[in-house]
């Protein structure tokens, strides 16, 4: 049996395809491993709240005398960066007692398994996202017709220790966080709120899960998942009701981490640039405007191609 074609041009074509396949696979593995993230200098935001994430995909450490809480695990490849940042600040990964997740996507849950293994911490995930996280990201209902892709782009599956509903409280000693399920980006997207004391000020921190409406999501019948439109509308209302002083997000660019970090150098109090109620409300307003515009567009043209064109 002849396995190599006789025609030279066909042999060349097969060779080119093989090389492209290797390159594309390598790039795909790198993208799903760390998404091109770079190490970012960790720092104190306010009180016992620290930034320990990468240059864009975020992770936050809340420290306490009875153990620490870590929000989000980034990509699989950013877990070592997070642990290095925690150590650089003088803390131990083994003192992290609770891992929290904003949502099930691989750029925020991908590193949870490694962080859990290193720390021994218990992982809390909302009921809406717990199955997807426990499966390494597979089966996310908010992915809609592209749900099948989640079975190929998977991350190491962590152990989900606790599943919670909206309003749940998570406590580690004096640290208390409230789970605000702000679904839409995913079915269990969770925005965490908690107080921090910075000097003589008590500040409310809100970590917004995500307000990004994915281009493949259908807000009209048939909805990507039943109730997604109502979920988005509830999320905007819920977030506005929270009296946030400091707001954070799953991506650093969304809340201006780098700009605020630079402003710390000249601020009277290094926490002051992060006290940004106006920016918080503006981010919600802009996200809702995008949602309303997309809803109106889908009501005019509900086709998948219409959604894809607008999402590009």
Can you describe what each PLM-predicted range is?
Residues 2-26, 273-312:
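C-terminal regulatory/interaction regions
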């Amino acid at each position: 049996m002849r396995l190599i074609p006789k025609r030279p041009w066909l042999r060349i074509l097969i060779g080119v395809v093989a090389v492209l396949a290797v390159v594309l696979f390598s790039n795909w593995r790198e993208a799903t491993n760390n998404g091109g993230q770079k190490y970012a200098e960790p720092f104190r935001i306010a009180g016992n709240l620290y930034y320990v994430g990468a240059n864009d995909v975020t992770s936050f450490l809340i420290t306490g005398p009875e153990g620490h809480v870590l929000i989000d695990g980034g990509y699989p490849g950013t877990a070592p960066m997070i642990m290095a940042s925690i150590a650089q600040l003088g803390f131990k990964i083994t003192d992290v007692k609770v891992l929290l997740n904003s949502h099930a996507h691989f750029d925020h849950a991908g590193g949870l398994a490694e962080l859990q293994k290193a720390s021994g911490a218990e992982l809390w995930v909302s009921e809406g996202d717990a199955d997807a996280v426990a499966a390494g990201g597979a089966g996310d209902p908010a992915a809609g017709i592209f749900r099948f892709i989640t079975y190929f782009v998977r991350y190491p599956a962590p152990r989900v220790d606790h599943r919670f509903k909206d309003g749940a409280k998570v406590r580690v000693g004096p640290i208390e966080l409230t789970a605000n399920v702000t679904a839409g980006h995913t079915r269990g997207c969770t925005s965490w709120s908690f107080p921090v004391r910075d000097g003589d000020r008590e500040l409310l921190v809100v970590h917004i899960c995500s307000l990004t409406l994915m281009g493949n999501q259908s807000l009209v019948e048939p909805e990507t998942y039943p109730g997604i439109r109502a979920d988005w509308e509830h999320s905007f209302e819920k977030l506005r009701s929270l009296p946030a002083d400091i707001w954070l997000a799953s991506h650093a660019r969304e809340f201006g981490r780098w700009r605020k970090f630079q402003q710390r150098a000249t601020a009277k109090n290094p926490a002051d640039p992060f006290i940004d109620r106006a920016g918080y409300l503006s981010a919600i307003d802009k996200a809702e405007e995008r949602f309303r515009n997309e809803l109106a567009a889908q009501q005019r043209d509900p086709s998948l191609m219409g959604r894809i064109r607008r999402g590009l």
